[in-house]
């Protein structure tokens, strides 16, 4: 848009140019996020996360809270140092490790009062309406993207390999 290029209709999205030019202060009502551990280095077998946030609150849906969350970070020296401290009795380190690896199904954070997302207020009366609104917005967005939640997560490897020739990732033994 900024380059005055004719944008093909097949491309989704909304121009950010009015915000850059100072004609608007807000781009969209919500920001959506998604993440998977399926097929990533040191990832859990399948731990999908979807999220939505507005200008104040963030809603996170962890599809498999009964599975330990793992990724490259959990194998890092920093994370291993937290584990070591936790095992030595450091209650703060123990709580950080637990919270990172064992996530509840639903998380809601008040980003104004809790910018580091430490106090999960999901299910509390004070945010019941907010939680329902954000949950509805996330489910509507997921539907618009063809995202079936855990079913989509379980099929993640198929999407990651799309367009690759068989054996393309195999290393050659030739010298």
Show which residues each predicted segment covers.
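Long, internal low-complexity/basic segments
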Residues: 89-106, 111-175
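C-terminal cap/loop subdomain of S1 sulfatases and analogous C-terminal strand-loop tails that border
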Residues: 5-107, 162, 166
């Amino acid at each position: 848009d900024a380059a005055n290029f004719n944008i093909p209709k097949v491309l989704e999205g909304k121009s950010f140019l009015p915000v850059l030019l100072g004609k608007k202060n807000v781009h969209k009502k919500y920001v959506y996020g998604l993440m998977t551990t399926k097929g990533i280095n040191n990832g859990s077998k399948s731990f999908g996360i979807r999220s939505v946030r507005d200008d104040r609150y963030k809603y996170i849906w962890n599809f498999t809270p009964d599975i330990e969350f793992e990724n490259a970070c959990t194998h890092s020296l920093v994370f291993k140092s937290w584990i070591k401290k936790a095992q030595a009795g450091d209650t703060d380190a123990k709580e950080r490790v637990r919270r990172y690896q064992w996530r509840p199904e639903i998380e809601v954070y008040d980003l104004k009062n809790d910018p580091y997302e430490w106090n999960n207020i999901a299910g509390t009366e004070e945010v019941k309406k907010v939680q329902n609104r954000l949950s509805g917005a996330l489910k509507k967005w997921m539907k618009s993207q063809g995202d079936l939640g855990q079913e989509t997560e379980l099929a993640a490897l198929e999407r990651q390999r799309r367009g690759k020739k068989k054996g393309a990732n195999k290393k050659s033994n030739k010298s």
